[in-house]
Amino acid sequence: MSDYVYYQGATFTVEWYQDASGHMKAKKYYEGLPREEQKRLDDIVAYLADSPLGTRLPKTLYNEEDSENKIYAFKPKDHRFFNFVTVGKKIIIIDAYRKHSQQMTRKDINLLKTVIASRNDYLVRVKGGNYYERHA
């Protein structure tokens, strides 16, 4: 299994996004968490990836953060892992951060903007045939 594949579920494959340089910011963030906090995300991801299409998780665990660009967040405790669903039943985790307040701060909103740009980068690179081919 490639180092960018996080979880291969019955319904979805969950992957870490790689930028053009091969960096995986969300994976690096995840690896810096204590094991019990990693396990919390592991459990949420496995549940969603193994569930039938159309399964909805509670908003306390998985929430739509940007409806226009279909950006979601896995929400293990006070961490947020931005992601989106794409063709081939893939969930791509782009970036992550530790939430500090009830509402999204300006810093959180700026991160969301970079997540949207990364999503667009992923889609362009996949369409151009130089995302998976480059990292194979």
Give names to the regions the model predicted.
Residues 1-78, 88-90, 98-136:
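Basic, Lys/Arg-enriched alpha-helical interface segments
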